[in-house]
Design a protein with these regions (language model features):
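Substrate-binding cleft of secreted/luminal carbohydrate-active enzymes
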Residues: 200-201, 205-216, 233-293
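Short, acidic/polar
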Residues: 45-62, 112-129, 184-196, 252-264
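Boundary/entry segment of secreted carbohydrate-active catalytic domains
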Residues: 26-66, 71, 107, 247-248
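Aromatic-lined carbohydrate-recognition surfaces of secreted/lumenal glycan-active proteins
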Residues: 40-46, 100-112, 155-190, 237-250
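Active-site groove signature of glycoside hydrolases
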Residues: 66-76, 122-152, 273
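Aromatic-lined substrate-binding rim segments of carbohydrate-active enzymes
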Residues: 70-106, 146-173
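Bacterial N-terminal signal peptides
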Residues: 7-20
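Aromatic- and acid-rich polysaccharide-binding/catalytic face
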Residues: 70, 133-146, 188-221, 274-280
């Protein structure tokens, strides 16, 4: 009888915890405006940019950029933060020019512990002057883990852990291009849009058209469809979006015009950029002027 009574007590406690958890209010969202305005991207392969961080920051500022997305590592990197000293100098130099810096990490979902550690490293990172990133982002695009169900669970768990640890630091998801997944759904069936939307503060889809879609109309239609799909898949017509086009040096004048027109006509995006800084030519910067805020 004592055993039964003890089991009932444990069951009651478990139920009360579950009910409390279910009824607990959702964590307040952080300020997504960090991801707003004209942006650009830097990845871990841009060694030349890190060789002279101050000059890089000066050139970025001259283009009127408001937010720089900087990759700290990916799941195959040898360390949790690549080039930390040079990265710190870049962050300090960008901040000195009034430019926000968002760190992003590309998880592979194969080694979940490593992905967790490297994601949290974005939050703990400090420059030599004590400065931190203004926001963090997870690039949920890797398909290295072939088990789709496990991949999705780990992606959502990783985002949830990072969101919990981030507090007031905003979190963005850099997802698969929604139009690309519509065209090739086997890439990531049942991508966890709604779960990630419930956790994050914004999305930054990389809506690449360069090389595959030629001309104004094809580019315009693709980008417009991608933005509509993102809102539909997340179930939130007001989801905060920073849209990234690209790859920058594969977009000709007509494609650039189509991308800019699609973003302008949409009228609901938070920010805009081309991937990436190293491949964005002067003509592309001029083309972005109408949507640079």
């Amino acid at each position: 009888m004592a055993t039964v009574r003890g089991a009932l007590v444990l069951l009651a406690v478990g139920l009360s915890v579950a009910v409390a958890s279910a009824s607990a209010p959702a964590a307040p969202r952080a300020d997504a405006s960090v991801f707003g305005g004209l942006g650009t991207w830097v990845d871990i392969y841009d060694g030349a940019l890190f060789a002279a961080p101050e000059q890089t920051a000066s050139r970025i500022a001259a283009r009127g950029v408001k937010v720089v997305w900087v990759e700290t590592a990916n799941d195959r990197s040898a360390v949790d933060v690549v080039r930390p000293a040079e990265l710190g100098r870049l962050v300090d130099s960008l901040h000195a020019r009034g430019i926000r810096v968002v760190a992003w990490y590309l998880p592979g979902h194969v080694n979940h512990g490593r992905d967790i550690r490297r994601s949290l490293a974005m939050l703990s990172f400090r420059t030599t002057t004590g400065q931190a990133f203004d926001g963090v982002a997870l690039n949920i695009e890797s398909t290295r883990l072939r088990n789709v169900a496990v991949r999705s669970r780990r992606a959502v768990d990783l985002a949830r852990r990072l969101r919990t640890a981030a507090g007031e630091t905003p979190l963005a998801i850099v997802p698969f291009n929604p139009r690309g997944l519509e065209r090739r759904p086997s890439t990531w069936p049942r991508f966890p849009w709604a779960d990630l939307a419930a956790i994050s503060d914004a999305f930054a889809p990389m809506v690449y058209t360069g090389g595959a879609f030629k001309g104004f109309d094809a580019t315009y239609g693709y980008v417009t469809r991608a933005l509509r799909l993102l809102r539909a898949q997340t179930g939130n017509p007001d989801v905060q979006i920073h849209v990234a086009g690209g790859v920058a040096d594969r977009l000709g004048p007509e494609e650039l015009a189509g991308f800019v027109a699609a973003v302008s006509d949409d009228g609901g995006v938070l920010g805009v950029s081309l991937y990436d800084w190293a491949t964005t030519r002067p003509a592309a910067w001029r083309a972005l002027k109408p949507v640079s805020g």
